[in-house]
Amino acid sequence: MDILERLEHFKDYKYMKRNQEEEIRKQEAIVHACDAMHLPDSLKNQLFQDVQEAKGKLIAIELEEQREGQELESFLNEYIQDDRIRYILCRHYIQQKSLLEVSKKISLSYGYTKMLSSKGKQMVKKVVIE
């Protein structure tokens, strides 16, 4: 893979993590709804297990992203001799990552129930765009 392909591939992790986090929020909402409806414990346990598996997948994605990021950084250091270009590429990667972290913190502090509403999604989008 060339540099641009590696950078583009690395950006895919952001979307994979976002999709997995959304799936976890949906599954947790289902578990809470089942709790409120006083459904059988066996069903609750199965749903809780599904949430734990989804969280495990998220951790696996994050570990793979970290490994890929380290490989990308060493690749950039090895093949790009110009410090300015390497700085710009790394800075772009860091900005992408920090924007995602800020939006995640806002969504967590705002609460996932509000996040599921359109108003919550617009709020996070505004922060990311600015």
Which residues make up each language-model segment?
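Short alpha-helical "recognition helix" segments of helix-turn-helix
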Residues: V102-I106
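DNA major-groove recognition helices of helix-turn-helix
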Residues: S109, T113-V127
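Short, conserved sequence motifs enriched in acidic/basic residues, glycine, and aromatics
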Residues: Y79-I80, S107
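N-terminal functional module detector in eukaryotic proteins
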Residues: I88, V128-E130
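N-terminal interaction/assembly modules
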Residues: M1-E78, E130
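Short amphipathic alpha helix immediately N-terminal
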Residues: Q81-K97
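N-terminal positioning helix adjacent to the helix-turn-helix/winged-helix DNA-binding module
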Residues: E68-L72, Q81-I85, L116
